[in-house]
Amino acid sequence: MFQRLNKMFVGEVTTSSSQEPEFSEKEDDEWILVDFIDTCPGFSAEEEEEDEDIGEESSAEHTSVFSCLPASLECLTDTSDSCFLQFESCPMEESWFITPPPCFTAGGLTTIKVETSPMENLLIEHPSMSVYAVHNSCPGLSEASCGNDEYNSSGPRMEAQSEMGKHIHCCVAALAAQATFLEQPKSFRPSQWIKGHSERQSLNRNGLRRQNLTRDCHTRQMKHSGWVVHQPCPRQYNY
């Protein structure tokens, strides 16, 4: 690299009189720089011949590959819309030929039908399985309802009579409920309420304790009735 810089500053020019392809090698610190100058016409002619040979071999390989293609792709190659079927003239690697599926390269053909497996639509809800769909499961009921509509339209008087009968029935039921509600206070008597309340209170634990205390106080007062000063008995429980 330093030699190259020195040559640029000093102005040394290397000229070669031979017509062979020129190679300029520069060694510096174990680095080799090779500059290939493609100015030889003989070498370019040789390259063109090699390219032609490679093109013939690749065309032969392509014909063999196209002969192995399925019938669907062969019919596609015959179509006028060849925008999707222009393959580059490159050698095949390991006899693999990668093409898009037929549905993308059909080019408007209607003869090719893309087959779909029934397992593809398992996650798609079928209209018969829809929750929001309204199914007519009873055609007999619908026919009967249509017949009833025709009959009702022919007889409006029957509708009016049926409505009046329903209204009267509702009024009678409401009056019967009101009568039973009014009869309940008459059957309820205060003596029965007092008796039941006293029984419930007497069976209570606190009520029994109060009765015992009142009895004890009354007996003590009877014992000390001869004294002049009457003092109240001490309260055992703070109620």
Curated annotation (Swiss-Prot):
Its gene?
Trp53inp1
Sorted alphabetically, the Gene Ontology BP terms of this entry are: apoptotic process; autophagic cell death; autophagy; cellular response to ethanol; cellular response to hydroperoxide; cellular response to methyl methanesulfonate; cellular response to UV; negative regulation of cell migration
In which tissues or organs does this protein occur?
Ubiquitously expressed with highest levels in the thymus.
**Location, primary (coarse class):** cytoplasm
Source organism phylogeny:
Eukaryota, Metazoa, Chordata, Craniata, Vertebrata
**Protein's cellular compartments:** Cytoplasm, Cytosol; Nucleus; Nucleus, PML body; Cytoplasmic vesicle, Autophagosome
- Segments carrying motif LIR: 25-37
What induces it, per record? By adriamycin, methymethane sulfonate, ethanol, H(2)O(2), ultraviolet irradiation and heat shock. Rapidly induced in acinar cells of the pancreas with acute pancreatitis upon caerulein treatment.
- Organism of this sequence: Mus musculus
- What protein is this chain from? Tumor protein p53-inducible nuclear protein 1
